[in-house]
Structures are given as C-alpha cells and as structure tokens.
Amino acid sequence: MPWPILCRDLLLAALPAIAACSGLHDEMTQYAALGPRYEARTWLATNANPYPLASNRFESATAGAAFVDSLYALGADTVYVMNVQEDSAWVAREGGPYADALLIRLPDTPESRQSLFARGAREARAEGFEPEADHDQRYLYLWWD
C-alpha cells in the first residue's frame, strides 16, 4: 500500500478517538473557566453559610445536602459545587461561601445516566431552561437563577 494511502487510512481510523478526546477537553475547559469547584458534600459540611447552595431553590444547607445526596443515590460519580462566591466580603456578609450551580460527573451506566438526566431536566424546566440531552458528555451542569 502506498505511503499516502496508509497514512490517510490510519488518520481516518484514529479520528473518532481524536474527536472524543477533543470533546472531553473542550468540556473540561468550559467548566474550568467557571472557577474553582469543590466536592459538594465536603463543601456543604464545612460551610457556615446557612444558605450556601442556590438559596432560591434550597431553603437550607440541609435541603441542599439532601439534594446532593439524591444525586449520588442516582449514581453520580462526583458532584461538585460551581460558581462559588468566596471572596472575603461575601464570606463576612453571608457567614460562608455561596454557590448557585452543581456539576455532576456522570457515570457510564445507562440507567444511572438516564436517571440523572431526568432529574436535571426537572430542575431545568423549573427554572425555565431547556433540559440538556445526553450526548455522551462526561458532565451535567445544573444552575439555579
């Protein structure tokens, strides 16, 4: 087989893997731009703010923690808090940092993914947003306005 054809065939065979890596990198870069993220259970357990998570959705830290626990029960690999307000003025005024978003690292199992996307869809619709569809992404982002 001539060299240019062999190179073309190898490149064509590798394109799906390259595209998958590129998509994951883009997804990770997108969320990294939103600032630091912290594992949600730990962050909530150590936060002195009485309303640390999306106070327009969760009436207390306990309610926010129960929601995070429900995501883990549905099969989330990891749940992170995002959009964290943690500057010293905010912390002094509120008693601790505040976040209004969660980032769910999705599992590979189809049943768990389906359950997490269904939960995400309910939250999105309640906020007036279009639910995100499962297109084999690694993360699901929830934000409360």
What is each stretch, according to the model?
Residues 1, 36, 135-138:
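Intrinsically disordered, low-complexity regions enriched in Ser/Pro/Gly/Gln/His and often acidic
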